[in-house]
Swiss-Prot record:
There is a cross-link at K149 (Glycyl lysine isopeptide (Lys-Gly) (interchain with G-Cter in ATG12)). One of its GO terms (cellular component) is vacuole-isolation membrane contact site. This is Autophagy protein 5. It is a peripheral membrane protein. It comes from Eremothecium gossypii (strain ATCC 10895 / CBS 109.51 / FGSC 9923 / NRRL Y-1056). It is found in: Preautophagosomal structure membrane. Keywords: Autophagy, Isopeptide bond, Membrane, Protein transport, Transport, Ubl conjugation.
Length: 293
């Protein structure tokens, strides 16, 4: 268990250096460039919107408009691609750095601080494909709990395990995400995911990026399907147009390129994310547009 615990600890403690730059349309004219951006370190195992209040507090002095709500109407973008708030930060990063990857190779040189640059935008109407954020922090928490209910149902055939948590444990579970308490979080999560006699299915999501959007698939992953139940067999079944012989695409989990021969059950056990799902990002070492049909 030592290696397993170390891998889990590393994924939980993984951080990203993020630069948030205001859309020029939101900025008071004449503001110096350094005042329209802020830098922060964000846990890979979190949601981007959890950090919106901090970002807006840092930048409110250069905004044309008053910040009436630290959540509603605000959204992140990267090179004209919507960055969804409702996926783990690390998964978004792993998926989106597949855009024009050759141009980004220089960012990963030794002794270089890699910064993920995002644009902060505002619009009254929700972007196509986005989940409207109208309920602030409570909506984020409710959404996260719903993900765990889904994951629990997939594993057990019901949501009894998570619904049976005491009120204090249920509150503590979310607080662990905010306060970064891995030990207590894992203890509660294991009570939800553990199943005697094996799982009914595995909660898995596959994230595939094009130059226009982030596409997410949620396949039904039952033990014993595709022969031995390997990652490669799943990807060839779900994305046959992408994973033919000689494909340059690579599956990445928590920033780690994983072997197609890996057993899905093992990957879930090691790399289940903070929302109860195993998130697989499809990345490419060369620039290309992934088919969407």
């Amino acid at each position: 268990m030592g290696v397993v615990n170390e891998l889990r600890q590393r994924t939980w403690s993984g951080m990203l250096n993020v630069e948030v730059v205001l859309n020029p349309k939101l900025v008071v004219q004449g503001m110096p460039d350094e005042q329209v951006r802020c830098h922060l370190r964000i846990p890979r195992e979190s949601y981007l919107v959890l950090h919106l209040p901090f970002v807006l507090n840092k930048l409110r002095g250069v905004l044309r408009q008053e910040v009436k709500d630290a959540f509603h109407g605000w959204w992140f973008g990267m090179e004209d691609v919507l960055v969804h708030w409702n996926h783990p930060v690390g998964t978004l990063y792993d998926s989106l750095v597949g855009l024009r990857p050759q141009e980004r190779a220089a960012q990963f040189q030794a002794n270089t601080l890699t910064m993920w640059t995002l644009t902060l935008n505002y619009s009254e109407d929700a972007r196509d494909g986005s989940v409207p954020l109208v309920g602030g922090m409570q909506q984020v928490e409710d959404f996260w709990r719903h993900q765990w209910k889904q994951a629990c149902y997939i594993i057990h055939g019901s949501s009894k395990q998570i619904m049976s948590l005491s009120i204090p444990d249920s509150k503590t579970f979310w607080d662990c995400v905010l306060q970064r308490d891995e030990r207590v979080f894992r203890g509660i999560a294991s009570r939800i995911t553990a199943r005697k006699g094996g799982v009914k299915a595995l909660p898995v999501r596959i994230h595939q990026t094009t130059l226009r959007e982030l596409r997410t698939l949620q396949p039904t992953v039952k033990p014993g399907e595709w022969g031995g139940g390997t990652l490669g067999e799943l990807l060839r079944a779900e994305l046959p147009e992408c994973f033919k012989n000689g494909s340059v695409l690579r599956p990445v989990v928590h920033g780690i390129e994983v072997s197609p021969e890996s057993q899905l059950a093992d990957l879930y056990h090691l790399f289940c994310s903070f929302d109860g799902f195993l998130h697989i990002s499809i990345c490419s070492p060369v620039a290309l547009i992934i088919p969407t049909t």
